[in-house]
Amino acid sequence: MATRMKSSPEESHSADNGAEAPSISKKAQQTRERILQAARDVVMEGGAGHLTLDAVVARAGMSKGAFLYHFETKRDLLLTMIDDQVSAFDGGQEERELPFVGDPDPWLSSQVSAMPDGGMQKMSAALLAAVAEDPTLLEPVRGWYRRQYENASKSPRGTDIAGIVLFALDGVFLAEMMGFPTFAAEDLSRLMHTLQALARGELELTPIDKR
């Protein structure tokens, strides 16, 4: 991970005066989150092209030196932002599955209900644009997709149905993320209900010759 949890000059001074290590770690974590939020704000407001170290430093209201204690380069910052994005998708999976306990595949059912909101989609689009300068930054995202489709291949609903659900969700997500026009909100909502019914086993795909 690119992030370095080093203590800033101010934190080092506190340590010299007998401050406990946990408080230093907490302060470093708070500073890290402050930087990441500043970077998110810059991207959300101006797009990936405006994501520069100077812009983030100014937005965070700190010195360049303090920033560099946590992120040495723009690549380090981007990698951490992407890792956090992946963690946001993965985090709380067990909790998201709770409403679907008893379904054939609670994991698959939860994927439909966990579609990211507009803010996360815009952030993802901006980050994808940013990593165009360094494709290796997409490795955490590739790893996440790999896990998703490994789960789908083992779904109790079957690979075909799980694959249809995931491919549809990916299509909706990527289209909206890139700002491509698709369905009206009402039609999209109906589509999501259909996908959810398919995931939960309330709707089945029956070949014509077996109807």
What is the predicted function of each stretch?
Residues 1-30, 205-211:
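N-terminal intrinsically disordered/low-complexity leader segments
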Residues 22-30, 46, 72, 76, ...:
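Residues at secondary-structure transition points
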Residues 28-42, 56, 81, 85, ...:
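Generic hydrophobic, amphipathic alpha-helix propensity
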Residues 34, 42-76:
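Helix-turn-helix
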Residues 38-46, 92, 168-175:
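Solvent-exposed, amphipathic alpha-helical segments
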Residues 87-125, 192:
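Hydrophobic alpha-helical connector segments
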Residues 111-112, 124-131, 165-169:
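Short alpha-helical scaffolding segments that buttress acidic/His motifs in well-ordered protein cores
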Residues 135-142, 146-211:
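Hydrophobic/aromatic-rich alpha-helical bundle segments in the mid-to-C-terminal region
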